[in-house]
Curated annotation (Swiss-Prot):
Protein name: Tyrosine--tRNA ligase
EC number: 6.1.1.1
Family label: Belongs to the class-I aminoacyl-tRNA synthetase family. TyrS type 1 subfamily.
A GO molecular-function annotation: ATP binding
Taxonomic source organism: Staphylococcus haemolyticus (strain JCSC1435)
Pfam families cross-referenced by the UniProt entry: SYY_C-terminal (PF22421), tRNA-synt_1b (PF00579)
Amino acid sequence: MSNALIEELQWRGLIYQQTDESSIEELLNKEQISLYCGADPTADSLHIGHLLPFMTLRRFQEHGHRPIVLIGGGTGMIGDPSGKSEERILQTEDQVEANVEGISAQMHKLFEFGTDKGAILVNNKDWLSQISLISFLRDYGKHVGVNYMLGKDSIQSRLENGISYTEFTYTILQAIDFGHLNRELNCKLQVGGSDQWGNITSGIELMRRMYGQTEAYGLTIPLVTKSDGKKFGKSESGAVWLDADKTSPYEFYQFWINQSDDDVIKFLKYFTFLDKDEINRLEESKNQEPHLREAQKALAENVTEFIHGKEALDDAIRISKALFSGDLKSLSGKELKEGFKDVPQVELSTETSNIIDVLIETGIATSKRQAREDVNNGAIYINGERQQSVDYELSNEDKIDDEFTIIRRGKKKYFMVNYK
């Protein structure tokens, strides 16, 4: 079974580095193991940049291994320097606690908990907060050489601009985590992003020095990159969150369906549980009939349903179809706000009602002549309905939820008109 797991991870492109490739494969063939991946609660929600390590952990669970999901309630008070060019701003304890609560709830969407072989959720504050300063320095610090720490990329990259002792010690805390989970839960493998290699190997080295433990390994996954060089995980509005209140299921769905042909197959391998035959079929469809965007639809549908559920996916598809067809009447005010979040927002005084004056005041048209031409030519739509009368007066019936009106000029240029 585990040979199949390794083959699947390799086919999906999910293995970047391993501390001991042959020993890891032998271990996975020999027994069902416990393994872990962690996340610090830097916000009250995960974003899609967190997804890949945890989805990889979930793949281990699908093959019979037991995942340990670690929320860094302790390390989150310190701050990981990995991948950061400057010092993190420390959060208050209350902030960290609230973030732990939010992220813990999201983990229940990603993993199966509560069974004999279900995932285990832990918070490293439970043990790190019990270590005294004297114990930290004597029992742990004595086994970690400064030269060894200075050799870590996460430390080296910060030396020129400066790094606090607080963040300098972070790698020791994560090393303590691995040792604790190894002793208490027989955890033998840590999975993380490629930026976590230094922290993972620190844990393995600490266990070797403190306990003579050699059966502890690390596996990292690649940094997710896009073919156009842009950073993965960002939309025009910013980070793409798993929290539906921060990024609506519709926006989430749109993020995935808008992935390019160059990236979509890689992302299907990374972020879905579709099998090899189905992904190969979707790749063939992309190559032969790219206009159908079947691969993008499969990606968006699978990831959205996995994170938000079937009902939210159905709503996202319904909103998308209505916006594409221009059938705005079928959508609620809330859904329209979601759909038009990124279009130009313009303000209109409630005294202005004639359609020509509205187009001028909002800047949709630059002159009365242009406004009249647009209306006469059928280029202006009010809430999805074409308006060709230059004498048309906007009324309260044109105000959605008594707040806004959607005006379209031409085929695709939308504006959200808010009343002041």
